[in-house]
């Protein structure tokens, strides 16, 4: 029966502490540079498995993710250096699957996208820094279902030429097609 053996590897300023089972990393592994944590990860028989936390040089987490069979799997959080959430994404078997959101450093939502098996599936929305909708486009299995609808930061639709639609024209179109207003 094989036993778990502690292992420490040092090279220059980097130190890796963990354990091996049958010669493969097994269990929690801590990686440090100059005495500061770089990553805390977990292995099962040499394969990334379970929770992992990565750190900025200052010590704050830069990412908290989950692994299964060596691939990202589950909720992943990515942080700004000050600790605020920059991105939340969901993975299944190493590809995006589920809702993904990205925020600006001030906490304003910048993008919300839905994925299925690594492809956009559902509505993609992007926002201006003031929080107003900038783009909206539905997708099915990675393919756009219609052209993106784009908006100015004061909520006016953009015409095909990229210029804001005049308010009178926007009003007129809303009368002709109330469901698109």
Where do the protein language model's features map onto the residues?
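Glycine/tyrosine- and acidic-biased, solvent-exposed loop/turn segments at the edges of beta-strands
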Residues: 1-181
């Amino acid at each position: 029966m094989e036993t778990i053996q502690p292992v420490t590897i040092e090279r220059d300023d980097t130190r890796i502490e963990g354990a091996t089972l049958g010669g493969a990393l097994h269990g929690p592994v801590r990686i440090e540079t100059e005495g500061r944590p770089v990553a805390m990860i977990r292995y099962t028989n040499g394969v990334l498995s379970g929770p992992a936390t990565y750190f900025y040089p200052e010590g704050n987490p830069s990412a908290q993710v989950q692994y299964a069979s060596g691939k990202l799997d589950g909720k992943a959080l990515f942080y700004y250096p000050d600790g605020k959430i920059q991105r939340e994404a969901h993975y299944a078997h190493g590809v995006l699957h589920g809702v993904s959101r990205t925020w600006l450093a001030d906490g304003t939502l910048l993008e919300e996208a839905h994925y299925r098996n690594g492809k956009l599936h559902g509505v993609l929305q992007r926002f201006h820094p003031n929080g107003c909708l900038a783009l909206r486009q539905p997708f099915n299995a990675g393919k756009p279902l219609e052209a993106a609808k784009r908006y100015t930061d004061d909520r006016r639709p953009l015409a095909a030429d990229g210029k804001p639609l005049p308010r009178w024209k926007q009003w007129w179109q809303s009368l002709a097609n109330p469901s698109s207003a």
